[in-house]
Amino acid sequence: MIRERICACVLALGMLTGFTHAFGSKDAAADGKPLVVTTIGMIADAVKNIAQGDVHLKGLMGPGVDPHLYTATAGDVEWLGNADLILYNGLHLETKMGEVFSKLRGSRLVVAVSETIPVSQRLSLEEAEFDPHVWFDVKLWSYSVKAVYESLCKLLPGKTREFTQRYQAYQQQLDKLDAYVRRKAQSLPAERRVLVTAHDAFGYFSRAYGFEVKGLQGVSTASEASAHDMQELAAFIAQRKLPAIFIESSIPHKNVEALRDAVQARGHVVQIGGELFSDAMGDAGTSEGTYVGMVTHNIDTIVAALAR
């Protein structure tokens, strides 16, 4: 069923490609600005900071959307078919959109921004080649942001000077953010730096900032937690007497709530420490609707709950 939906999208895309080549996306925009289409919000936020008003931007995946399970809609295919530049994370994050990106590559600029990260700095996995959640290490995410910047310069070479100035200013924000996360993390004793979440998305966070991390589900939310997984993690939490576990904005809360109940059945009371933004940012117009705000919210929430 899933494959049929993807193939239908690819077929529609083939028809769309001919249409957009005939008319051109720039002709569709009265101001002549190119269209940039992104997948996850963290990439869209980088485009906003670097390109600002020099492009039209369409982000396909909004707040609360799980990119592991996301399938391109007919509307998405139309946006992608009209795009001058497509930016996605890669590393098998947007698994169900792979055929669509492959179809479009060659007819326009299509960039997997996190596949520019050196292989030596990626986390290897058993069930997939690499962990795609690179944005949890702010310094590592800077590689992806640089790929966004370089792609925008290719798209609009006449704007390179402006893009460079904005990119450098944004990179300074990221450097300050990384330093802030490190300070906050170090404010917790080492034995308190244990993070339990709905799925195993925080591996890069663990490596960069000195946390032990456990996820109820695997790296991809397409994998389901078994009863054995639930009981094993509940035993770990009770044994370590952890004060808090965390829900995620893009994943239903029921599994973490069931985990809390399983821990309490073992005689240890654990709290839901708050909601973290993992695979999607917060609502537009809020601090958490930006990458800097999302990361700041996460570390503040984690430290406050684990310090109890």
UniProtKB/Swiss-Prot annotation:
State where Zn(2+) binds: H68, H133, H199, D279
Taxonomy of the source species: Bacteria, Pseudomonadati, Spirochaetota, Spirochaetia, Spirochaetales
Q: What does this protein do?
A: Part of the ATP-binding cassette (ABC) transport system TroABC involved in zinc import. Binds zinc with high affinity and specificity and delivers it to the membrane permease for translocation into the cytoplasm.
Record-linked Pfam families: ZnuA (PF01297)
Q: Subunit comment for this entry? A: Monomer.
The residues that cross the membrane are: none
Q: What is the originating organism of this protein?
A: Treponema pallidum (strain Nichols)
Top-rank taxon, per record: Bacteria
Task: Quote the protein name from its UniProt record.
Answer: Zinc-binding protein TroA
Gene Ontology CC terms: periplasmic space
Q: Which is an annotated GO molecular function term of this record? A: metal ion binding
Which residues constitute the signal peptide according to the record? 1-22
